[in-house]
Amino acid sequence: MKKIGRGIGLSFYGTGYGNGFPDVSKARVRLLEGGKVGIYVGGTEVGQGAKTVLTQIGAETLKMPVEDIVFVHEDTVHMPDAGTAAASRQTYNTGNAIRVACENFRNKLKELAREHLALNSIYGLKVENGKIYLDFFPQKSLSFEELFEKSSKGDIEAEGEFVAQTVMMEEETGQGAPYWPYTFNACGVELEVDTLTGLVEIRKAVFAQDVGRAINPHLVEGQMDGGFAMALGYVLFEDLNLKEGKINNNKFSKYLIPTAMDTLEIEKIIVEDPESTAPYGAKGIGEPTMIPVGPAILNAIYDAIGVRITELPVTPERLVKAIQEHEKEKGEVK
């Protein structure tokens, strides 16, 4: 018999390392030949889209096209440490460090332009589209390329640092802010349970994710799709068989992960509520997108068959066994 169930899962997630561990990101910005700008951070791009979003943050702060930004990362010798690509912290922490570095860089450009343009001060100077100009007299201007040629090449740079703010928990009240910021989400699924075979099929899913501000909506949707697929594997497929510290099912023929046939097109709702301390309001959503999916699936299974599953993954064998035990208990009660 096939039964339909619906379930909802909710979560909130504190980004960053949290209390008790220094959470620091640093960035360097440098003027390059041809008027391009290099952004240097020791943060890792693992496919989550950090390189794209961090480039966009730099381009927005410098008011220049993203095509003119050269993003350099993952070189621990020549660039400042931006911390790990973990705890959903790169967009918020390193994004803030880049914003600060770009603001310092803008001020440095204004000072240099003031000297070359023989101006009294930097007041009225604007930095946009690869040039520095006087707002009320635009003829007084200097392009990034011209400034690079006029200066000692390679020495026009600035750095920025961001340290995440947290509040230690009060011992008596338990109140505090061990992480900041927090992100929130919700997931709802409709699924079908085959009570004979134990197979579970997700029929429909809706996912709502708070992102602060979606700097790159396509990447946000990609994170939501990826988090859902990863959680699907965690809940229904990936059964790690360990014995004496050794993985027994170390082949994909034995350790199953979701394929394109197992996933589905989910309805994605991006919730924007800009975070005041974040770079242009954006928050990280790496890990959070996975968290509510499991509870939603487990609640939907319970809704379908009336059995609470407390062991993951919910393999067909475990599900059939749980159903049989539940039926046996009902029979004994009668």
Give residue ranges: language-model regions:
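Cofactor-binding beta-sheet edge motifs in enzyme active sites
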Residues: 1-334
